[in-house]
Amino acid sequence: MSLTLRVLAPDQSVFDGTAEEVILPSTTGLIGILPGHISLVTALDIGVMRVRANGAWNSIALMGGFAEVEADDVTVLVNGAELGKSIDATTAEAELEQAKAKVSQMEGQEPSTEKIKAQQNFNRARARVQATK
């Protein structure tokens, strides 16, 4: 038994195939999906989705969105996504360091749009780095 998995971003279909297991970064924590899972709709956080297909684990960096599980069909609709194997690890690490420096620089400041954007950029950069591993 397997799952039918589709990961869709506004500009591309990131994954469309079968999987034995999916681990999603929901806003309340990680959710594991196996064949026969109960129906579910959940919000997704910025993070890494893990997919076990053909016995091998693959990572996909997700930039927030929603997931729906119905029977053995899993549909993931996200604001953006990248396959871990297509991310340049060196570039991703450098972007993470820049984002971390920006967040540190804003520490102690009052909440602002700029501070929120800096934190979101940090979360995205961290997800991209984690997806390369």
From Swiss-Prot:
The Gene Ontology terms for molecular function here are: ATP binding; proton-transporting ATP synthase activity, rotational mechanism
Subcellular localization, as worded in the UniProt entry:
Cellular thylakoid membrane
Tell me where the signal peptide lies. Answer: none
Q: Where is this region: Disordered?
A: 103-133
Superkingdom, natural source: Bacteria
According to the record's subunit comment, the protein's assembly and interactions are: F-type ATPases have 2 components, CF(1) - the catalytic core - and CF(0) - the membrane proton channel. CF(1) has five subunits: alpha(3), beta(3), gamma(1), delta(1), epsilon(1). CF(0) has three main subunits: a, b and c.
Classification via PANTHER family:
ATP SYNTHASE DELTA/EPSILON CHAIN, ATP SYNTHASE EPSILON CHAIN, CHLOROPLASTIC
Protein name as catalogued: ATP synthase epsilon chain
* Species assigned in the record: Prochlorococcus marinus (strain MIT 9313)
